[in-house]
């Protein structure tokens, strides 16, 4: 086992604080509408330019093991804020730095670290309650656009695109962000259910020019296993032919004789038909087939449920207004399923999302929920260079999460003002002893940090701005760094999601409390590697007679 180095009390906390400062100083330059960019070196390709706090934090790894521990703890604050609310990572970092800095000073002055932490926790509870009280619910699409614009660092185009996307697919819908090929940022909305399986044979195509199969008002047969012969299906196929409506078969696979028979019937014009593979794999495939069945008002033909192919009747088939199948994907629009059944299925998936601990499962469940509930929107981010596209994509991602959070818990005045005015809620909070009161004071001072930093980044004195705002009793009154004007920020459209503000403060206080109460640190001593010995030049002696 390698030897360890141990640091105690003040020495340990000073090292931690140094690491916290290095990381926080790199992150906080990005805060606010006039925040600057940070350039991140990549081991391959062009450097990455970003204004996203968490991306900067993730890149930082310090040489000194003890300083690195402090930096990694604050990195945790940024990541947690990104996980919970999707934004507010820079605010969380600035708050954590402010609390740690004041806390370390107080501990050095002889206060009890545990009482300081308790005081900090008391203050945070009071502030969170106060912020929640002032939260306003979002009602209009314009307000959604404002949140998106602020979170994308004042980019109105991004705000509008996100608002349109949320209007189209609803709050449950999935919005994904991709890189576009061109210069423009555009929005693609897929209404209805789409899954990534295309037609099994190009002979099913109805529009040869576009190579798509369009089925109007088709019956939909959902089969869990492979179809290799159609003998068992003949009664139901005849019923479909008589109804003169098209048929879509979704099964694990359609092969051999079954596929050949369907193709021949399609070419002869006897039966308008198309076949696609079922989406997903294993248990997820079963669940997705069940989703499609509920959406289209049909039944999954499965031997687990005791339904055999030969017993299938036409009323077991689902229907939809229109189905479009390309080489890669299938879209079902306007399924005939019962609204109550669809809502019940959505509630069930929501419950599963709450219960799961796996990020991958959660993502897949959210996709399923979106396909059932609303649809899928894809924002394609364009730009002149790859570096610009990546930077913009980061901002769009942040903005998307922020708007989601805003719809969930409402909004408060932006620009760090919500936290600044929450200072007043601490007047009535008293700790059990003087040290806890100091903890409350630490939070009181830290709550000014975001406003000050936004002002500093805009080239104005932060202390002057914070002082001027605290003189005003209107809790929405703030400094608009974009225009340099003091005004009512909610009216000016400078708003932050309540969830983002709350998560930033709670995350920052949690980690800062742990850092303040640190009394010893243990890290591995890096082993000095000996320089490589020079190679032996023996054996070269026989070169004497070379006659140079």
Curated annotation (Swiss-Prot):
It catalyses: ATP + H2O + a folded polypeptide = ADP + phosphate + an unfolded polypeptide. CDD domains: GroEL. Coiled coil: none annotated. Keywords: ATP-binding, Chaperone, Cytoplasm, Isomerase, Nucleotide-binding. It is found in: Cytoplasm. Its main location: cytoplasm. InterPro entries: Chaperonin_Cpn60_CS, Cpn60/GroEL, Cpn60/GroEL/TCP-1, GroEL-like_apical_dom_sf, GROEL-like_equatorial_sf, TCP-1-like_intermed_sf. Residues 538-548 have a biased composition (Gly residues). ATP binds at residues 30-33, 51, 87-91, 415, 496. Residues 529-548 are annotated as: Disordered. Its EC number is 5.6.1.7. It is an enzyme of class 5 (isomerase). GO terms for molecular function: ATP binding; ATP-dependent protein folding chaperone; isomerase activity; unfolded protein binding. One of its GO terms (biological process) is protein refolding. GO terms for cellular component: cytoplasm. Forms a cylinder of 14 subunits composed of two heptameric rings stacked back-to-back. Interacts with the co-chaperonin GroES. Together with its co-chaperonin GroES, plays an essential role in assisting protein folding. The GroEL-GroES system forms a nano-cage that allows encapsulation of the non-native substrate proteins and provides a physical environment optimized to promote and accelerate protein folding. Belongs to the chaperonin (HSP60) family. NCBIfam families: GroEL, PRK00013.1, PRK12849.1, PRK12850.1, PRK12851.1. This is Chaperonin GroEL 2. It comes from Rhodospirillum rubrum (strain ATCC 11170 / ATH 1.1.1 / DSM 467 / LMG 4362 / NCIMB 8255 / S1).
